[in-house]
Amino acid sequence: RECVMQISWLQAILLGLCACLSSMPGMGGSSIGNYTLGRPLVGGLVCGLILGDIRTGILVGCAMQVVYIALVTPGGTVSADVRAVSYIGIPLAMAALSSYGLDAASADGAALATSFGTMVGTLGTVLFYGTATINLVWQHMGWKAVEKRQYRKLYLIDMGFPWISHLICCFIPSVIKC
């Protein structure tokens, strides 16, 4: 009998950090963070490395990438958050495949993976807008600093405070869900 995959706290924390890095433009930039690390194909590889099953991670990532390959975010609107798909959906799908004894390369395995991806993508959208809403507080603080000509405060407001938003709406949910 095969061992069922379990996700440890350390693995969940690493997945949460990857989720944060892939959603913060200030970290890797949009090109590396959101448009590379946050995509399911790359996220599948990263999840596979963290969870110790690279083959399943890549296959699950491929199945989810097919669903979201043409996803665009015009004007900042988000219909599905691929960061959540990559770092919540893929690990959960990998654990589910393991517990059901399904191969990720099978049709049933791919169907299970994509169902997890679409479910979590919708949840991720809510979390994305939660982050954006909290960031409005920092924006208001930034405008006040500009009005008072306290330009040095802008570094903290622009680069430091958004981490709080991402910890609340990205890191913590990713760790808890995994």
Model-identified regions with their sequence ranges:
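Membrane-water interface at transmembrane helix exits
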Residues: 22, 26-27, 51-52, 93, ...
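Small-residue-rich segments of transmembrane alpha-helices in multi-pass membrane proteins
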Residues: 41-51, 87-97, 163-166
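Membrane-interface helix-loop-helix junctions at boundaries between adjacent transmembrane segments
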Residues: 63-122, 141-153
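Hydrophobic residues within the alpha-helical transmembrane core of Major Facilitator Superfamily
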Residues: 17, 53, 88, 123-126
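Hydrophobic transmembrane alpha-helices
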Residues: 5-84
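Helix-coil boundary and interhelical linker segments in multi-pass alpha-helical membrane proteins
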Residues: 5-13, 47-58, 94-117, 178
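Helix-loop-helix junctions within the multi-pass membrane cores of secondary transporters/permeases
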Residues: 107-178
